[in-house]
């Protein structure tokens, strides 16, 4: 249940909770910082292009960690790069989220077995909220992952830990295709 689902009384008053207002504002203006390290970055760039139009979801890419609330890690993270990933993560303001995109950032990809220099998943150095599988994942998969981050934000409550919010999200999974179709119908109607 979001802000727009709240009850409207007397056509002048909106009755809702502070959690709903704060979460609606945060999920409606998600500012990701892309950290593309390999071929997954090409798919991330394609997702930002006009074909997929992330701005219709309220997602506006940023290039500075100080302006971002979501880090998109895409590609092979090496041991030398790990320090920089941690530094960028620490520069992001709270609340901050991490989306790991592709096999390499999720688990080391095809390089994990024979590459001593490859990190076996970015979650070994920073906490990851959403994983997007694939090698490389299609833009539709990335949009689905971004929508999961938005659902995670929607379920947050003041005083509720992120772990509990993740459990709620696992109990009530979302269907990204249905939401994209709903967005298309709304755009056609207007």
Swiss-Prot record:
It is a peripheral membrane protein. It comes from the Bacteria. The keyword Cell cycle does not apply. Signal peptide: none annotated. It catalyses: a quinone + NADH + 5 H(+)(in) = a quinol + NAD(+) + 4 H(+)(out). The lineage of its organism: Bacteria, Pseudomonadati, Chlorobiota, Chlorobiia, Chlorobiales. GO terms for biological process: aerobic respiration; electron transport coupled proton transport. This is NADH-quinone oxidoreductase subunit B. Binds 1 [4Fe-4S] cluster. [4Fe-4S] cluster binds at residues 39-40, 104, 135.
């Amino acid at each position: 249940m979001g802000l727009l689902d709240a009850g409207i009384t007397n056509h002048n008053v909106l009755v809702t909770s502070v959690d709903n207002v704060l979460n609606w504002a945060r999920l409606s203006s998600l500012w990701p910082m892309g950290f593309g390290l390999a071929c997954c970055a090409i798919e991330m760039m394609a997702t930002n292009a006009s074909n997929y139009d992330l701005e219709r979801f309220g997602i506006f890419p940023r290039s500075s960690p100080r302006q971002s609330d979501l880090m998109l890690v895409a590609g092979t993270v090496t041991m030398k790069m790990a320090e920089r990933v941690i530094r960028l993560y620490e520069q992001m303001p709270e609340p901050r989220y991490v989306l790991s995109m592709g096999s390499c950032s999720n688990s080391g990809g095809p390089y994990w077995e024979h590459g001593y220099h490859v990190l076996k998943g970015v979650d070994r150095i920073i906490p990851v909220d959403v994983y997007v599988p694939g090698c490389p994942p299609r833009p539709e998969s990335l949009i689905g992952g971004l929508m999961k981050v938005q659902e995670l934000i929607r379920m947050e409550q003041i005083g509720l830990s992120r772990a509990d919010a993740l459990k709620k999200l696992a109990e009530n999974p979302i269907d990204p295709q249905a939401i994209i179709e709903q967005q298309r119908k709304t755009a056609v109607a207007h």
